[in-house]
Amino acid sequence: MAKITIIGAGLAGSEAAWQLAQRNIPVRLYEMRPHTMTPAHQTDHCGELVCSNSLRSDDHSNSAVGLLHQELRGLDSLIMRCADQHRVPAGGALAVDRHAFSAAITEALEQHPLIELIRQEIVTPPMEEDGYTIIASGPLTAGGLAHWIEAQVGKRMAFFDAIAPIVSHDSIDFSKAWKQSRYDKGDGNDYINCAMDEAQYHTFVQALLEGEKVAYKEFEANTPYFDGCLPIEVMAERGVETLRYGPMKPVGLTNPHKAEKSYAIVQLRQDNKLGTLWNMVGFQTKLSWPAQKRIFATIPGLEQAEFVRLGALHRNTFINSPTLLSETLQLKTQPRLLFAGQITGVEGYVESTACGLMAGRIVAHKMRGEAVSIPPQTTALGALMRHITGEADATHFQPMNVNFGLFPNFTERVPKKQRKEAYAQRALTHMQQWLQENS
């Protein structure tokens, strides 16, 4: 049997290798460290956590990422097994002893008889006619490999993300907000609009200028801004009126709630096909998360908004997966090539693990000539996979954490306070059914 090639032994690559080897499929796992280090890594361990040691909430009843933890445990995830073995006290979060965690992953991979861990930088991935290659090189993919990937995907690759906050549709106050496209173009209701008067606008701009910012990490410091994705607070620094002539311009829109003309308008654009998530247009930011929640809650209509994703700008290499990848993570133009982890546009340790797990399972089925089945969209894993391979807005695609806004709504009414738990119960039931059908 041909060996499968995996490039990158981070969380996604390590998990993909484990899933394949556990199904008796030999794997060549390439990791360039320690011979070539990244600006962020400190060791040569597989699955090294380069930022926080937290895998976020472990509450599977009220947290989408906690639900994803539980689903991954049921799928024999190596990463989750090592995390549970080396967890440290962190309240309701799953935090780990960073060194022991990555050392355990490395040991498991090195000792598996079907995994060959090769310490070598790959610039041109090997493409075998009877095998598959999984690229899981992570958010710091650079150099020759980045150039090779860019040659395969064209211009649909980014090296810096510009993430605007995303709001749950159900949490927007439509006694103040309204749906309308500028000059009533398109369907006429393509945007949600939140109007400000002059006093509200000037208070908002001042809050942006005074809000605490997140410092760049050392390896991000020299990454330039692009005029098309300036942080909103940087635009505010260029002049008090800049925003109302930019992303907050009020022209072409009529507020049905007030007769007087709006001084500035915040627009939100639909971010997924389900219509459950709405993106704050032009609001990419380096404000701290507490500052974002405080300042953006002053926008009329967003006072009680649920932010399923907050804004950020940082170094991040990722492809436009909704355009490029099939639902099985295969490059549409080269089906023998798969992508997994943060390079696909999933955001976060657990999401990268989940993507790697699915890539490994998919290739295993392909190698055996078996039909491939993706978990239903009602599960955390299925919702995340469908988001990056087609449900997301490809025109404005940016990395995404797992969240309940990716899940289909219920056909029957569920009270808001019970909704998260209901999502979780439905997900675990459907995942169990899927596992029984796809064991």
Curated annotation (Swiss-Prot):
<keyword id="KW-0819">tRNA processing</keyword>
<dbReference type="GO" id="GO:0030488">
    <property type="term" value="P:tRNA methylation"/>
</dbReference>
<keyword id="KW-0963">Cytoplasm</keyword>
<keyword id="KW-0808">Transferase</keyword>
<keyword id="KW-0489">Methyltransferase</keyword>
<comment type="function">
    <text>Catalyzes the folate-dependent formation of 5-methyl-uridine at position 54 (M-5-U54) in all tRNAs.</text>
</comment>
<dbReference type="GO" id="GO:0002098">
    <property type="term" value="P:tRNA wobble uridine modification"/>
</dbReference>
<dbReference type="Pfam" id="PF01134">
    <property type="entry name" value="GIDA"/>
</dbReference>
<keyword id="KW-0521">NADP</keyword>
<dbReference type="GO" id="GO:0005829">
    <property type="term" value="C:cytosol"/>
</dbReference>
<dbReference type="GO" id="GO:0050660">
    <property type="term" value="F:flavin adenine dinucleotide binding"/>
</dbReference>
<dbReference type="InterPro" id="IPR040131">
    <property type="entry name" value="MnmG_N"/>
</dbReference>
<dbReference type="InterPro" id="IPR002218">
    <property type="entry name" value="MnmG-rel"/>
</dbReference>
<comment type="similarity">
    <text>Belongs to the MnmG family. TrmFO subfamily.</text>
</comment>
<keyword id="KW-0520">NAD</keyword>
<dbReference type="GO" id="GO:0047151">
    <property type="term" value="F:tRNA (uracil(54)-C5)-methyltransferase activity, 5,10-methylenetetrahydrofolate-dependent"/>
</dbReference>
<feature type="binding site">
    <location>
        <begin position="8"/>
        <end position="13"/>
    </location>
    <ligand>
        <name>FAD</name>
    </ligand>
</feature>
<dbReference type="InterPro" id="IPR036188">
    <property type="entry name" value="FAD/NAD-bd_sf"/>
</dbReference>
<protein>
    <recommendedName>
        <fullName>Methylenetetrahydrofolate--tRNA-(uracil-5-)-methyltransferase TrmFO</fullName>
        <ecNumber>2.1.1.74</ecNumber>
    </recommendedName>
</protein>
<keyword id="KW-0274">FAD</keyword>
<keyword id="KW-0285">Flavoprotein</keyword>
<dbReference type="InterPro" id="IPR004417">
    <property type="entry name" value="TrmFO"/>
</dbReference>
